[in-house]
Amino acid sequence: MDSSQHHPWVGNWKLESETGFVDWLIAQGATTAEATAERDIIRRHTTLTIAVDDDRVDLIWSTNIRGRLRRTKTVLSYSLDGVSVTTTDTPLGSVSATAAVEQDMLVHRVIGPRGTETHRRHIVGGRLHQTMTTDDPALSTTTCELIWRRTR
C-alpha cells in the first residue's frame, strides 16, 4: 500500500495559519522579535515534507529565501515504534525524541532542557493540524496549533 494512502499526513505542506505559535516560541526562550521572525520565515519560505519508509518517518524542513543566501534543509528521522530514541542538538540543548502512530495521528514526544513536548499531527478537512504542547515545570503548560495546507 502507498504510504500516503496509509498515512494521510505524508506529503509536502506549507504553513497556512497558526494559533499561539509566537507565544509558544517565547515560552521556549525566544524573544518576541525572534519568535515573530521565525513564524514569518516558516509561513513564507518553508516547506515541511513528511515521508514514511518502512517503519521510519522523516520530517524534512526546507527553507528557501529568494534573493538571499539562506537555504536550509533539516532532516529529522525517527523510528515509528514509539520506543527508539533519536537525539538531536538544538539551540536550547540536546533533546531526545520518539515517534509513533497513534490512531490516525503522527505523535512525537520530545524531552529536553525545558521539559517534555508532545507534537501531534493529523488531518482535518484536508489540512494537516499540528498541535504542540509543552509541559515545563517552570512554566504553565503551553499549547499552540499550526495548520498546514498540502502542496503539489
Segments (PLM) and residue ranges:
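Hydrophobic small-molecule pocket/channel-lining residues, especially in calycin-type beta-barrels
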Residues: M1-R152
